[in-house]
């Protein structure tokens, strides 16, 4: 079976070899753990964002930069293609580990989740558990983790602290923005899973999403980065299903436009909800447009729509 952490460790080695070139900085903590700053106290950039995206997906996807057109304005975008959608996106990339220790908080994603089984139910559903001596984690946080955080992660992953490798970037950084848009395929798979679809039927995934500019603090950037997927993210999946009628119904329910909160920038929705995630419709976290091709029935279905106007409003780009 593929080890996402072994693949992640190979990427870490590459990052350490090229850290000056890609504007990142590593340090080894007293307990031996390696922390790689990709945007907290360093500049980072598109190269750092690409490395974070590769880490999150455990190098089980082809990732490239491209552009999308937003009402005549070309903006940077990221394109993902994978033949290992459940392992790459759900066993690794999905930000399913909420790490809160003392006054430190960060969302954990990437290979280490496959050791800690975060969350356990998901790994049981897809039938995956990694076995590796090293844990590789990507943290979305504005602070670098301490020895205490490393000990917590090492314990949950059953590895020694010196075998913990963590790459970190805040949402309000170029690298952070890139790796969030790189979740476009994963976001669609997660939405399909949440409405009851058997994601083990998904055999490949492809997606494109714009990359948000830095619009403010982490909370505001969380809004614009989510909007990239919600309003302009496009995904295409190949499945082995066979029940075309049922599949058509799932495709209808999958896009973000089915959410009651759809239609305005996410930051506005979040603010109106008193910055309480539990008051925001979870169904909103989905790509704008989803297409599925079924290899068994030979049928294809598409649903959703692109909304560049809302994304431009979220970006706040002034035409001068």
Swiss-Prot record:
SUPFAM superfamilies found in the cross-reference section: Methenyltetrahydromethanopterin cyclohydrolase
Gene Ontology BP term (one): one-carbon metabolic process
Database matches in CDD domains: MCH
Keywords recorded for this protein, A-Z: Cytoplasm, Hydrolase, One-carbon metabolism
Pfam family, one: MCH
Keyword Oxidoreductase recorded: no
Major site of localization recorded for this protein: cytoplasm
GO cellular-component term (any): cytoplasm
Coiled coil regions, renumbered to chain: none
E.C. no: 3.5.4.27
Domain of life of the organism encoding this protein: Archaea
Record family assignment: Belongs to the MCH family.
Xref: NCBIfam families: one_C_mch
Protein's name according to its UniProt entry: Methenyltetrahydromethanopterin cyclohydrolase
Organism: Methanococcoides burtonii (strain DSM 6242 / NBRC 107633 / OCM 468 / ACE-M)
